[in-house]
Design a protein with these regions (language model features):
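Beta-propeller blade-edge and WD-like acidic-aromatic loop motif
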Residues: 14, 22-41, 65, 69-90, ...
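Conserved beta-propeller blade repeats
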Residues: 1-18, 45-69, 93-115, 139-162, ...
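Active-site and glycan-interaction determinants of carbohydrate-active enzymes
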Residues: 304
């Protein structure tokens, strides 16, 4: 999957690194966030390790359960949390990397990416209640790193490519159920990612770097060549639709959650836009290439807050250590 180093070491021995948020990757909690930015822990006292490289949470269609990627000594697995303060159960048990969960439209199964076959990331599905064995849903030549589906689940919208921080190779493609040949949806010489279909399946929102930075775009679906609209103008990542289809939420270049009001009954039109709250100031996680949060039917956001419940919002710091190798050698000689 996509992962990014938090440090760099030069040949001359200078070390540069980000300190991260107080509490580290092993301390995080699931929270509800209102449109005004009020943060409330889902289950006070419950903390978990979301993993150092990426976080992911997906809300079930009925809003009663959350699928969360949790990193333990056993590996990165998908767990299911009963909301709000209900039990937590482990869903996947393979030592491979199980990531980026999505719910089936009927809420009975969870779809996720996994490298457990050893040939890159494939798409897997497993009953959400833990019964039955997981099975491969799609095994393509390219790595599958994201998925979404329209309401009738007749097609897969997939993001292919882009491992280890590569740029310009992330593409969105469509694959009809039962077919083996993908068709390009947004596959141009820059990165297209974070695919999000509208609740009625008529519109595809995604982020693209075609202007030189990530912005949010919308195209008709599945006939993507019949139009294209730019939703954001000050940077945009992680598009998510409101469950009524009347808003697109995304995080702008300043790290603020933005609500764009849209009309898609006839053609598509953005009729308004307003920032809601700062994601960065509240230590709320967001993925660079996919939406790592979700939206409930009542308009609240289900997000992961890093640093734990006692964290006071200590920001990341960039630290430069000169002659780091010499210091290490000196300590080893002691």
């Amino acid at each position: 999957g996509d992962s990014y180093p938090f440090y760099a070491l030069s040949p001359s021995g200078t070390l540069a690194y980000w300190t991260g948020v107080a509490g580290g990757a092993g301390s995080a909690e699931l929270v509800w966030v209102t449109r005004t930015g009020e943060v409330t822990p889902v289950d006070p006292g419950w903390e978990f390790n979301p993993g150092a490289s990426e976080v992911a949470v997906a809300l079930s269609p009925d809003g009663r359960r959350a699928a969360v990627k949790i990193d333990t000594e056993a590996g990165e697995d998908i767990w299911v949390k009963q909301l709000d303060a209900g039990p937590l159960s482990r869903l996947t048990f393979d030592p491979g990397l199980d990531r980026r969960p999505r719910w089936s439209k009927d809420g009975r199964s969870i779809i996720f990416t996994s490298d457990r076959l050893g040939d890159g990331y494939d798409l897997w599905i497993q009953p959400a209640d833990g019964t039955g064995a997981p099975r491969v849903l799609l095994d393509l030549k390219e790595a599958i790193l994201e998925v979404d589906q329209p309401p009738d689940e007749s097609m897969f919208v997939l993001r292919l490519g882009g491992l280890a921080g590569a740029t310009g190779v992330r593409d969105l493609v469509g694959l009809r159920a039962g077919d083996s040949i993908t068709a390009p949806l947004a596959a141009e010489p820059y990165d297209e990612k974070a695919a999000a279909l509208s609740p009625d399946g008529r519109w595809l929102a995604y982020e693209s770097t075609e202007t030189g930075r990530d912005e949010i775009y919308v195209r008709p679906f599945p006939d993507v060549n019949n139009g294209k609209w730019q939703v954001s103008s000050q940077g945009g990542i992680n598009p998510r639709w409101a469950r009524n289809g009347r808003e697109i939420f995304y995080i702008n270049g300043d790290g603020s959650m933005v609500a764009a009001t849209v009309s898609g009954t006839g053609g598509f039109e953005v009729t308004g836009s307003q920032p809601l709250f700062s994601v960065n100031d509240r230590n709320l996680s967001n993925g660079a290439n996919y939406a790592s949060w979700d939206v409930a039917g009542d308009g609240r956001f289900l997000m992961i807050r890093t640093g734990g419940s006692d964290d006071e919002g200590v920001p990341n710091e960039f630290v430069l250590v000169q002659n780091w190798l010499e210091e290490v050698r000196a300590r080893l000689r002691r």
